[in-house]
C-alpha cells in the first residue's frame, strides 16, 4: 500500500502500521515531519517540515495476513453451511434442539428480524453466546466476582449454579482511573449526599429537578475542561443521540468518521441532516469531503450548506486509536466547519492532567466547538456532559430533548463525579489523581509492549488504554473468552457485526487499579492461550527490552 501524505493509510480491509509526528496542513495536503509506515512487511520513512504535533504519535494497524483472512472466510463459510443444514434438520424435526423453530401460534406473524440477522443469531451467535452478558456480583474493580451459569439447550437459556467465581481479573470494564470501588472518599461523600438528597430527583431540570448539586457539578466540569460553560445529562448515550439533532437539521451536513459510536450515528440520523462518511482517521478523506461540500453545496439546489459539522471521537473504543485532533482542527479552521468531539473514552484517560485528547495534544479547548464526554468510565459514575461557549450551553438547555424531557441526574451519582473530578484536579489536597493518571499511562505502555513482544497483532495508539488483540477466526472468539475465564481472567470478545467480518478481536481495557503483578498474571495466561489457539499472527514482533523498567512513561513533551 502506498502511504498517503501525513502517513495515514488506515483503510479497510487493508491495515498498516504507522506513526506520525509533527504534521501540518500545507496547500490543502497533510504533511508530517517524521512518519513511519509499515505495509506488507516494508518500512517507509518520510521526513518533512511541520509543527502540528508536539509529541510522538504512534499507532499500529498491522495488515491481516492473507492466509488468516482466507481461513477466516472459510470458517464463516463452514458455519453458514452447517447452519443451513441445521435449519433443514429443524424443519423436519430431526434436530433435537427446537428452540430455534417458530411457534405454531406465531406462524402467520410478520417477522421481527431480517432473514440474515435471524439466521446469524440462530446458527452463529448462539454458539458463543455464553461469552456475553456474564453477571457479576461485586464492584467492577481490578478484580470481580462472576456468577457461574450453565446452559443445557445450546445457549438459548442459562441457569445459575449457585457458585461464585471469585477474584477474576477484570480486563473488560472502563474503570480507567480506578474510581469504581465501594470504599474511599468518593463513596463516603456519595453516601452522605444520599442521606440529604435521597436517591432520585423525580423531575426534569426544567421543572423542580434542578438541584444546587447540578449547578456545582456543571461549574466544576466547565473549569475542568477549560471552557465557558457545561451542561450535564443522566445518560451518556443520550448525550450524543439527543443533542446532535438540536445542533443540526435539514440543510446541514454531517461529516462522520466511519468508526464513530452508535450514539453518534443515531444522533446524526435523527437530526435529518445529510450524512457523509470519511475513512477512519484519514485526513485526506475528510478534506476531500470538505472541499466537495463547499464546491458543490447541497444536492440538486447547489445552495451552500447551512452548517458543516465534523463528528469524531477522542479514543475509538473498538480500534484503540486516538483521533488526529491537531489535523482535524487545522482542517476545521481552514474550511470554516464546526467540530463535535466525543471524549467518552479519552476524558480522564489521556493527557498529563487527565483532561482528555485536547490536553493530550496540548491544544486550546476553544478550538473545539462542542466538547462531549461521559462520566461512566474514568469517573466511575454515569451520565454525560456537553462543554463549550456559554451561548451554546444556553441554547441546549432549551432545545436539547435530553435536557428538557429527561429526569435529572441522581444526587449520589453527581457527588461521585464531583469528588472524583476534584481528586483528578488535585483539589482534594492529595496527589492521588495525578498518580492514577500516571499509573494508567504506565500500565498501558507496559501491557501493549508485552503483547507485541509475544507476537500478537495489537491495534491502536501506544497511549490508548483500549487494547484490541486480533482473533480473526469466528471459532476463536468463543474459545478465547472461555479459556481466559477458566484461568480467572475476564475479557471482552467482539465479532461481526460489531467489527468487520474478518476482524474479530478481544478488547482489553487497562486501569490504574491494575498492579504490575495483576498485569503479569494476565499476560502469562494470555501468552499460554495465544499458543494454545495459535493467535500470534504478527510478522513484526519487536525484540524484548529486558533492561527497560516498568515505570517508563512520561508526559513531558518530546523535543523536535
UniProtKB/Swiss-Prot annotation:
One of its GO terms (molecular function) is serine C-palmitoyltransferase activity. Induction: Expression in increased by palmitate at protein level but not mRNA level. Expression is down-regulated by microRNA miR-9, miR29a and miR-29b-1 (at protein level). Pfam families: Aminotran_1_2. The modification N6-(pyridoxal phosphate)lysine is found at residue 377. The chain crosses the membrane at residues 65-85. It is found in: Endoplasmic reticulum membrane. Its EC number is 2.3.1.50. The keyword Calcium does not apply. Its cofactor is pyridoxal 5'-phosphate. Component of the serine palmitoyltransferase (SPT) complex, which is composed of SPTLC1, SPTLC2 or SPTLC3 and SPTSSA or SPTSSB. The heterodimer consisting of SPTLC1 and SPTLC2/SPTLC3 forms the catalytic core of the enzyme, while SPTSSA or SPTSSB subunits determine substrate specificity. SPT also interacts with ORMDL proteins, especially ORMDL3, which negatively regulate SPT activity in the presence of ceramides. Forms dimers of heterodimers with SPTLC1. Belongs to the class-II pyridoxal-phosphate-dependent aminotransferase family. This is Serine palmitoyltransferase 2. It comes from Rattus norvegicus (Rat). The lineage of its organism: Eukaryota, Metazoa, Chordata, Craniata, Vertebrata.
Amino acid at each position: 500500500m502506498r502511504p498517503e501524505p501525513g502517513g495515514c493509510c488506515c483503510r479497510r480491509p487493508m491495515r498498516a502500521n504507522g506513526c506520525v509526528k509533527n504534521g501540518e496542513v500545507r496547500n490543502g495536503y497533510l504533511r508530517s515531519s517524521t512518519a513511519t509506515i509499515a505495509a506488507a512487511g516494508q518500512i517507509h520513512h518520510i521526513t518533512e517540515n511541520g509543527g502540528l504535533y508536539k509529541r510522538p504519535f504512534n499507532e499500529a494497524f498491522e495488515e491481516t495476513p492473507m492466509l488468516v483472512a482466507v481461513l477466516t472466510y472459510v470458517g464463516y463459510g463452514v458455519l453458514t453451511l452447517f447452519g443451513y443444514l441445521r435449519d433443514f434438520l429443524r424443519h423436519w424435526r430431526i434436530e433435537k434442539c427446537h428452540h430455534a423453530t417458530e411457534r405454531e401460534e406465531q406462524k402467520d406473524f410478520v417477522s421481527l428480524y431480517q432473514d440474515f440477522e435471524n439466521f446469524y443469531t440462530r446458527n452463529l451467535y448462539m454458539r458463543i453466546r455464553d461469552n456475553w452478558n456474564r453477571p457479576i456480583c461485586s464492584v467492577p474493580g481490578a478484580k470481580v466476582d462472576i456468577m457461574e451459569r450453565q446452559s443445557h439447550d445450546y445457549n438459548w437459556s442459562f441457569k445459575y449454579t449457585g457458585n461464585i467465581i471469585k477474584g477474576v481479573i477484570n480486563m473488560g470494564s472502563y474503570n480507567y482511573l480506578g474510581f469504581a470501588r465501594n470504599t474511599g472518599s468518593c463513596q463516603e461523600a456519595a453516601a452522605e449526599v444520599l442521606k440529604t438528597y435521597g436517591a432520585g430527583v423525580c423531575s426534569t431540570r426544567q421543572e423542580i429537578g434542578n438541584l444546587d448539586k447540578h449547578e456545582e457539578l456543571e461549574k466544576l466540569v466547565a473549569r475542568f475542561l477549560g471552557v465557558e460553560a457545561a451542561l450535564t445529562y443522566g445518560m451518556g448515550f443520550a448525550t450524543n443521540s439527543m443533542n446532535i439533532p438540536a445542533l443540526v437539521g435539514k440543510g446541514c451536513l454531517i461529516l462522520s468518521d466511519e468508526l464513530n459510536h452508535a450514539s453518534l450515528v443515531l444522533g446524526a440520523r435523527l437530526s435529518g441532516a445529510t450524512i457523509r462518511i470519511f475513512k477512519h482517521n484519514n485526513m485526506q478523506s475528510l478534506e476531500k469531503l470538505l472541499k466537495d461540500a463547499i464546491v458543490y453545496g447541497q444536492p440538486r439546489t447547489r445552495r451552500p450548506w447551512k452548517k458543516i459539522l465534523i463528528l469524531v471521537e477522542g479514543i475509538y473504543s473498538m480500534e484503540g486509536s486516538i483521533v488526529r485532533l491537531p489535523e482535524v482542527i487545522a482542517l476545521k479552521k481552514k474550511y470554516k466547519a464546526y467540530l463535535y468531539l466525543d471524549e467518552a473514552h479519552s476524558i480522564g484517560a489521556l493527557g498529563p492532567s487527565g483532561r482528555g485528547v485536547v490536553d493530550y495534544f496540548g491544544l486550546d479547548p476553544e478550538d473545539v466547538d462542542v466538547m462531549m464526554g461521559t462520566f461512566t468510565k474514568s469517573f466511575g459514575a454515569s451520565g454525560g456532559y456537553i462543554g463549550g461557549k456559554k451561548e451554546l450551553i444556553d441554547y441546549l438547555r432549551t432545545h436539547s430533548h435530553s435536557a428538557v424531557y429527561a429526569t435529572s441526574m441522581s444526587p449520589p451519582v453527581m457527588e461521585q463525579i464531583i469528588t472524583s473530578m476534584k481528586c483528578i484536579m488535585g483539589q482534594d489536597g492529595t496527589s492521588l489523581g495525578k498518580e492514577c493518571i500516571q499509573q494508567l499511562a504506565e500500565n498501558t505502555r507496559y501491557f501493549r509492549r508485552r503483547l507485541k513482544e509475544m507476537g500478537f497483532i495489537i491495534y491502536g495508539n501506544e497511549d490508548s488504554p483500549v487494547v484490541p488483540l486480533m482473533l480473526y477466526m469466528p471459532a476463536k472468539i468463543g474459545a478465547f473468552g472461555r479459556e481466559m475465564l477458566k484461568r480467572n481472567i475476564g475479557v471482552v470478545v467482539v465479532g461481526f457485526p460489531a467489527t468487520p467480518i474478518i476482524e474479530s478481536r478481544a478488547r482489553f481495557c487497562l486501569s490504574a487499579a491494575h498492579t504490575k503483578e495483576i498485569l503479569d498474571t494476565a499476560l502469562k495466561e494470555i501468552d499460554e492461550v495465544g499458543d494454545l489457539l495459535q493467535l500470534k499472527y504478527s510478522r513484526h514482533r519487536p525484540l524484548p527490552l529486558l533492561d527497560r523498567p516498568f515505570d517508563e512513561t512520561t508526559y513531558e513533551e518530546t523535543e523536535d
